[in-house]
Amino acid sequence: MEPQLTSTTVAGARIELIRCGKGRPILFLHPHIGLEQAQPFIKLLAADAEVLAPSHPGYGESERPKGVTSIDDIAYLYLEMLSDLDLHDVMLVGSSLGAWIALEMAVKSPERICRMVLVGPVGVKFSARDKLDIADLYAIPDKKFVELAYHDPKLAIRDYAAMSEEQLIVVARNSESTARYAWSPYMYDPRLRHLLYRLHVPTLILWGASDQFAPLANGQNYVEAIEGAKFMEIANAGHFPHIEQPEATAAAISAFIQSRSVAAKQKEVA
C-alpha cells in the first residue's frame, strides 16, 4: 500500500498527515529535517500496521496553531489528535527531535501509549549545563552537519536549483520551526529528565553506529534513565537510520514488537 497524503484538523489548525497500512496504530514523529526521504521507511513500517506520520506544526505544509511554541505544546497537540481519532494502545516511533516529542507525550499520557521506539533521541540533557550533549546546528556550517549526521553524506545532498518554489518553502519552514522549538535551550527540555520515572512502557532505543551529531555514548544515558529500555545499534547509519538504513531499522522495530508480543502471551499463559 502506498502512503496517502492527507490532513487532519487539531485545535483549529490543519496538520499535514501521511497515512499508510492497516492494523495497530503507529505514530511516526519525524526529525528536524521533516518527512523528507521518510516514505520508504513508512511503507516498511506499515507492513502490518497503520502508520500515521504528521508534519509537525510549522513543518511541511502543517499550520501552527496560536500558542504552540514548544515541543511540550506539540506533545499536547498530538495527544489531542490521538483522542480526536479515537486511537489507543498507540506505538510511538520518533527520530531525533521526533523522539523528543514522543518522550514528552509518553510522560504526559502513558496510558495511551503501548510501546515506544526512540531513534537517536534528543530532548534530555545529561551533561553539565555548559557542555553540549549534541553538536550545535547553529554553530556549524551545513557541510559539517552532513559529515556528522550521515554515514553516507551523499544521501544528504540537495539540489536547491532543481527544487520547486513549494519545496524550497518547506525547507525554509522546517528550519524556522526547528529554531522556534529547539534553539533555547538547545535541543532539550530541562524538566524532562526528572519526569522519565513516569515511563513504564516497553522502550527500544536505536542509534546509528556512525552518528557523530549525537554521539553513540549518549544512547547509554537514555538506557540508564528509562526503566527497562533496550538498546540496539544500526550499522552503516548516522543520525537518521530510517533514511540511511530503512530496512534494518524497520526490521529492528518489528523484532521488538514480536518479542514483546511473545512475552505478553507467555505471561498470560503463566
Regions found by a protein language model. Give the residues of each.
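Conserved alpha/beta-hydrolase catalytic His-Asp/Glu region
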Residues: 127-128, 143-203
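Conserved HGGG/HGGXW glycine-rich cap/lid loop of the alpha/beta-hydrolase fold
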Residues: 11-61
